[in-house]
Amino acid sequence: INRKRFVALDRGHKEPPPPPPPPPAALNGRRLRVSGRKSLEGALLGTGFPFRDNQIDNLDNYLNMFRSLVGQTAGIRRAGAASLDLAYVAAGRYDAFWEFGLSEWDMAAGALLVQEAGGLVSDFTGSHEFLEKGHIVAGNTKCFKALLTTIQPHLPPSLKR
């Protein structure tokens, strides 16, 4: 209920109270927080490159997205797995991330980390159906919005739904 923890204690049986809950998203005991960057200028982004046959049709659109971002950021990286890229966003190592052609298991855990760390996650249209649609945008509030705005003009019709 509103992300609060409720506990029912039976003091009559002298049971100890439960331990305090761990932070929502943590690394080595420290709470994860998305970066505080305010724009894409100087941002470090993560992405994945289309590689399956059914994604190659969208390669030109992807490259247009890439071109529109590479000049205004500090760089674009690929860690090797979408889940790891999303964890980097949650830890503030990346300011934002985008990719398409993913499966639910590629995104679910990392998306939860980003949300727990104070970030935003959506599909390319800004809705919360990224698990169903297989494409994702994630980041801190400012970079997320700027990334979404920058890539949307380059979306093929199949990804605008």
Language-model features, listed with the residues they occupy:
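An extended, acidic
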Residues: R33-R161
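Generic detector of contiguous secondary-structure segments
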Residues: A25, R31-V34
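DPxDG-like acidic metal-binding loop motif
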Residues: I1-A26
